[in-house]
């Protein structure tokens, strides 16, 4: 695989920079990073950028999308071949604005990127995860938002130093204003980084029964995830634990599913696990088509037995 001269990265979520650098270092000879403040600059420095660009006029109420004009002005001057962003809600909103202002091709939620004969090729899901599309980008600049868990994080070198420059703030014609912030209870779990995950679906009859699921997860030293109906229909678990096409994409060593039917929208998120073990009382459940190991049984009988055996 050939490499581009330079790849630029930006993320509104600082935790995603390691993954972005992991991809950028693979696809580009040199990596440049855009960050929102000096604290992020210090955190990103060990990943090995050629230069760091710090966005000016940042404060707690500033919205990421308002930096589109500032970043666009910078990129017009530097002429990179690729801008890589984290595929967050705000990252994709910013990417859309930059695509218009720079007349650049945009691929959202990319699951793979390759450089073939100097051309950038990106893969992404379509039709709700039922298929993958391969896009060959012909514009001088490619803007790509990278799905979480796709790229291995890069290693860090705390001794690395590079120049830091400030990017002047160019106010957009219409700013998005944040008038107030309210605290939101959220899970600190990041399933995309978990080594073992226990997933629960509609086979669970009541919210109180999550207790046995967490007990099993504790024995396995695993995190707990769920299908979309559990998170957004029943509201039994946090949105951060939803596994699926518009949720978390797993890259775990083990994914143990309990009462999950295995619809394609869910398996888009679960299929990245190295080993899938399925427990479902319906022998015709689609999940068994994906599972490396399957057990036809009632989770209310199987899970307590597993906890008992694994606790010995």
Curated annotation (Swiss-Prot):
The keyword Transport applies. FAD binds at residues 254-282. SMART domains: ETF. Keywords: Electron transport, FAD, Flavoprotein, Transport. GO terms for molecular function: electron transfer activity; flavin adenine dinucleotide binding. May play a role in a redox process. This is Putative electron transfer flavoprotein subunit YdiR. It comes from Escherichia coli (strain K12).
């Amino acid at each position: 695989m050939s490499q581009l001269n330079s790849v630029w990265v930006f993320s509104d979520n600082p935790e995603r920079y390691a993954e972005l650098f992991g991809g950028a270092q693979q696809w580009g000879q040199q990596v440049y990073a855009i960050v929102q403040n000096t604290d992020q600059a210090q955190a990103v420095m060990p990943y090995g950028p050629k230069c760091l660009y710090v966005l000016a006029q940042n404060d707690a109420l500033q919205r990421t999308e308002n930096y589109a004009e500032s970043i666009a002005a910078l990129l017009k001057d530097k002429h990179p071949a690729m801008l890589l962003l984290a595929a967050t809600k705000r990252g994709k909103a910013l990417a859309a604005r930059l695509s218009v202002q720079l007349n650049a091709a945009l691929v959202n939620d990319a699951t793979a990127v390759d450089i073939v004969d100097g051309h950038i090729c990106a893969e992404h899901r379509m039709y709700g995860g039922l298929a993958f599309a391969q896009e060959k980008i012909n514009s001088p600049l490619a803007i790509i938002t990278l799905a979480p868990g796709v790229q291995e994080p890069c290693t860090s070198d705390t001794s690395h130093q590079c120049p830091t420059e400030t990017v002047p703030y160019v106010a957009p014609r219409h700013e998005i204003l944040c008038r107030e912030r309210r605290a939101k209870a959220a899970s600190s779990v990041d399933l995309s980084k978990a080594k073992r995950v226990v997933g629960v679906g509609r086979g669970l009859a009541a919210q109180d029964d999550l207790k046995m699921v967490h007990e099993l997860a504790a024995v396995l030293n695993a995190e707990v995830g769920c299908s979309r109906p559990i998170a957004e229909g029943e509201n039994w678990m946090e949105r951060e634990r939803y596994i699926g096409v518009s949720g978390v994409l797993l890259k775990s060593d083990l994914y143990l599913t309990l009462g999950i039917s295995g619809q394609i929208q869910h398996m888009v998120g679960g299929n990245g696990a190295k080993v899938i073990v399925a427990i479902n009382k319906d022998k015709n459940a689609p999940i068994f088509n994906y599972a490396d190991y399957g057990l036809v049984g009632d989770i209310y009988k199987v899970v307590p037995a597993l906890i008992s055996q694994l606790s010995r």
